[in-house]
């Protein structure tokens, strides 16, 4: 059969015509679908703006609080339950609703914004064991200012929640995370130290904060170390907490006895400490002993974890140590500390915080019983010092709690403080 006759036969065949038509329709639909997909990709690329915030970013918690404030009509929610312990010891429960994982739409300054909160169940945070999360904002247009405004509002909202409070951070893995809720700032005058001691420390810290250029011009590392030593209960940690509130700084709590703390991790934590924060190393004598005592017990000298003594020294004042940092260390036994740890450059100011003096006792009495005659405070101090000359502010405060509204009774029974 000639080729022309074969083509004419196919043309007259109804089955072939129908099949060819179906192929044509299918091809057209596939091309249209591909065109729509390419069009959507081009539209998203050129006419939409997207912002992704991973859970590790510091603004992630801010944005969740911001979403809670702005997505009041969202019907798909997750709950975050937390416990708050008051100074009286009473514990209250707080519930906070946040948008659940999924897609949400909010109206913000004349724009619809799509918010996608995603949770990867196959990926977890090895430090906390929680699934990996992220939140993605999508808006029409190409102006990034809308996202800057959202981040700025979220930051301001977080600052309002922390206003007048001190934020505590603790080390979790390789980063600092807030520890509990921000605490109400403790007034500096609520911690009564020996006369002039608090003013001397505050003046030194403030001078350091206000003069970074002085250190730079002279080639001196811009960091400052403090050591407060003395008997337990004399106000070392309490003063540091009050000082942070006075300076509007946060506190980074770091335990040197943490078994997971290594040299590299310590150096990293000190380098990524939040700005405007005080790094607090409490009871440093419990982690390391003097090298003179290490001969008898070398294992104890090397600490309870993977942190080495040389690693601590290098983190505080080594080639890789960071600047713009304030470190406070406390100890009850300064004689147990190695001289290399407390030399200038690592510890620039050492202050003894000891038992109550006559002046401290009078100040504490007047603060606890305002409006009483100064002679009563003098009388109380004399009675206490006759009973004992080694009494800590914590003991005096505990004693006052027994006579909340009875200053005369506190004076008459001061002999009970005798050891």
UniProtKB/Swiss-Prot annotation:
GO cellular component terms, A-Z: mitochondrial inner membrane; mitochondrion; respiratory chain complex III
Tissues/organs with expression: Ubiquitous.
Membrane side Mitochondrial matrix: residue ranges: 33-419
Modified residues (Phosphotyrosine): 181
Alphabetical list of SMART domains matching this protein: AAA, BCS1_N
Phenotype upon changing residue 35 to R: In BJS; with mild mitochondrial complex III deficiency
Membrane topology, Mitochondrial intermembrane segments: 2-15
Residues reported in the UniProt entry to bind ATP: 230-237
Outcome of swapping residue 78 to G: In GRACILE and MC3DN1
Reaction catalysed by this enzyme: ATP + H2O = ADP + phosphate + H(+)
Related illness: GRACILE syndrome: GRACILE stands for 'growth retardation, aminoaciduria, cholestasis, iron overload, lactic acidosis, and early death'. It is a recessively inherited lethal disease characterized by fetal growth retardation, lactic acidosis, aminoaciduria, cholestasis, and abnormalities in iron metabolism.
Protein name in UniProt: Mitochondrial chaperone BCS1
Native source organism of the sequence: Homo sapiens (Human)
Gene name, Swiss-Prot/TrEMBL: BCS1L
């Amino acid at each position: 059969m000639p080729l022309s006759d074969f083509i004419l036969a196919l043309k007259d065949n109804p089955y072939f015509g129908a099949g060819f038509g179906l192929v044509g329709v299918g091809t057209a639909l596939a091309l249209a679908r591909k065109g729509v997909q390419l069009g959507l990709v081009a539209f998203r690329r050129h006419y939409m703006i997207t912002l992704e915030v991973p859970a590790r970013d510091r603004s992630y918690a801010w944005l969740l609080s911001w979403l809670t404030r702005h997505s009041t009509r969202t019907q798909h929610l997750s709950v975050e339950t937390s416990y708050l312990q008051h100074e009286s010891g009473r514990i209250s429960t707080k519930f906070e609703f946040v948008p659940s994982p999924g897609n949400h739409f909010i109206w913000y300054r004349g724009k619809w914004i799509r918010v996608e909160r995603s949770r990867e169940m196959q990926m977890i945070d090895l430090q906390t064991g929680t699934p990996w999360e992220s939140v993605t904002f999508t808006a029409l247009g190409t102006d990034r200012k809308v996202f800057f405004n959202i981040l700025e509002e979220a930051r301001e909202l977080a600052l309002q929640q922390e206003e007048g409070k001190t934020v505590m951070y603790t080390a979790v893995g390789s980063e600092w995370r807030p520890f509990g809720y921000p605490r109400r700032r403790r007034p500096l005058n609520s911690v009564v130290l020996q006369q002039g001691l608090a003013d001397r420390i505050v003046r030194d810290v403030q001078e350091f904060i206000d003069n970074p250029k002085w250190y730079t011009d002279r080639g001196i590392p811009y960091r400052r170390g403090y050591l407060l030593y003395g008997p337990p209960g004399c106000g070392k940690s309490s003063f540091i907490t009050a000082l942070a509130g006075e300076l509007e700084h946060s506190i980074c709590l770091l335990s040197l006895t943490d078994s997971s703390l290594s040299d590299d991790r310590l150096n990293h934590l000190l380098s990524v400490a939040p700005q405007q924060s005080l790094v607090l190393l409490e009871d440093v004598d419990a982690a390391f002993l003097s090298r003179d005592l290490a001969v008898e017990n070398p294992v104890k000298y090397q600490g309870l974890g993977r942190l080495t003594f040389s690693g601590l020294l290098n983190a505080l004042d080594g080639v890789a140590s960071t600047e713009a940092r304030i470190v406070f260390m406390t100890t009850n036994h300064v004689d147990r500390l190695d001289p290399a740890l407390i030399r200038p450059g690592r510890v620039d100011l050492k202050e003894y915080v000891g038992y109550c003096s006559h002046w401290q006792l009078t100040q504490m009495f007047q603060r606890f019983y305002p409006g009483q005659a100064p002679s009563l405070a003098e009388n109380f101090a004399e009675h206490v010092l006759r009973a004992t000359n080694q009494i800590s502010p914590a003991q005096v405060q505990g004693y006052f709690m027994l006579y909340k509204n009875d200053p005369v009774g506190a004076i008459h029974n001061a002999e009970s403080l005798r050891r």
